[in-house]
Amino acid sequence: MAEMEIDAVRENLKEVFDFVTAELKTRTEDKKLIRQIKLCVEEIFLNISSYAYNPGTGSAKIKVSVEGNPVPIRVYLTFMDNGHPFDPLSEEAPDTEAELDDREAGGLGIFLVKNTVDGISYEYKEGQNILTIVKELPVDSEA
């Protein structure tokens, strides 16, 4: 397992991407899969940087582990922050069938994450938001 702790500010997104990508490339070169995971990382990290400590700032801890030998191989990404308690899984799914002008703002990002990953969980424990996403690697994507 690899982990990093970083200031939860938008400007650090590239560093988070580099960290996650380096860990993923130890097990896969599947560019589509890496793009999907990076999209989820972007949504989650930017939500932490925008809302977790508002007003104010704080840090985010990101853990990456790849498990499974030989298959199925699963990538676990855990995001932790000490910000305001917020369970994104409790939010109502946006109405993607509604006209754009009739939609409520927000919620599309976590909807996208939920529909991209194979598993997602949230807990608030000891003053921390802990969000974990799981993505299964296709059998033929192992490096």
Residue ranges and their predicted role:
Residues 1-3, 49-143:
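Conserved beta-strand-loop-beta-strand hairpin that lines the nucleotide-binding pocket
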Residues 3-15:
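STAS-typified acidic loop motif
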Residues 11-14, 26-31, 83-84:
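Short acidic/polar alpha-helix capping motifs at helix-coil junctions
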Residues 8, 39, 124:
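Conserved strand-loop elements at the edges of beta-sheets that form or border functional pockets
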Residues 18-42, 46, 102-104:
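Conserved short strand/loop->alpha-helix "switch" segment adjacent to the catalytic nucleotide/phosphoryl-transfer site
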Residues 10-13, 34, 38, 110:
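Short, structured helix-loop boundary elements
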